[in-house]
Amino acid sequence: MDWILICKALILGVVEGLTEFLPVSSTGHLIVAGSFLNFNDSHAKTFDVVIQFGAILAVCWEYRQRIVSVVSGLPSRPDAQRFTLNVVIATIPAIALGLLFEKKIKAVLFSPVPVAFALVVGGAIILWAEARQRERSEPPRVMSVDALTPLDALKVGIAQCFALVPGMSRSGSTIIGGMLFGLDRRVATEFSFFLAIPIIFGATLYETVKDWQAFTVDSLGLFALGLVAAFVSAFVCVRWLLRYVATHDFTVFAWYRIAFGLFVLLVGYSGWLNWA
């Protein structure tokens, strides 16, 4: 196996794991990093989905007791049924729009410059949302994931649709959207984690069936390396983020998004790099 390809797979796996659950857009970072590393062949998008699967496995492991409890309680426990219903409701809008506009989005927006614009716009939205949070005098309306109503779930699901634009961030859209709709910061973060499970599992299955030719003997090793790197880095990131949101807001991520987006634009328009 080519050592350069191994290094690229590991780098992209770590990038995915560190950015999947932060409000900075993992897809945007993978597009920029893949272009910079010249890792953007016909199977690159399949590789990206595979390593996203590695990141979601980290969430499944972190919340394994909760997931087992919900699954085992589905036949008889109302709280498990309500939680599952909320996840399904919140997942439907993004899946529906994604299936309708997938080809157009990938053709028009899956390149570094559109991603950079989305990073900057998303950063500005986070700054605005955090300013609104500071102006609020009343406490959040929803203080537990189990207290979410189907309407709350639908609102978060609609917010998740913004993440179809690469660079906007799925976690950023759901967490910030949830906070604006009255969810406590930690509740919005945890619900965002759970929403990622069906979305990314579905995307992995879809891409696997659609591009099964990519899973050759040579590519399986690279996919496995990227998946493991994404799993480990995502596991560390999830645990860190849960501690972080207990005492901090997302302003630092907003400024990072804006700075990174402007840097990508500067590099592209200055001719220093020819973004693919």
Curated annotation (Swiss-Prot):
EC id: 3.6.1.27
GO biological process, one term: response to antibiotic
InterPro entries referenced in this protein's UniProt entry, alphabetically: UppP
Pfam families tied to this protein: BacA (PF02673)
Membrane disposition: Multi-pass membrane protein
Reaction(s) catalysed by this chain's protein: di-trans,octa-cis-undecaprenyl diphosphate + H2O = di-trans,octa-cis-undecaprenyl phosphate + phosphate + H(+)
GO molecular function: undecaprenyl-diphosphatase activity
Transmembrane intervals: 83-103, 108-128, 187-207, 217-237, 252-272
Keywords, in A-Z order: Antibiotic resistance, Cell inner membrane, Cell membrane, Cell shape, Cell wall biogenesis/degradation, Hydrolase, Membrane, Peptidoglycan synthesis, Transmembrane, Transmembrane helix
GO CC aspect terms: plasma membrane
Annotated compartments: Cell inner membrane
Note, other: Bacitracin is thought to be involved in the inhibition of peptidoglycan synthesis by sequestering undecaprenyl diphosphate, thereby reducing the pool of lipid carrier available.
Database matches in HAMAP family: Undec_diphosphatase
NCBIfam families: PRK00281.1-2, PRK00281.1-4, undec_PP_bacA
Similarity remark: Belongs to the UppP family.
Annotated function: Catalyzes the dephosphorylation of undecaprenyl diphosphate (UPP). Confers resistance to bacitracin.
Name assigned to this protein: Undecaprenyl-diphosphatase 1
Organism: Burkholderia cenocepacia (strain HI2424)
Gene designation: uppP1
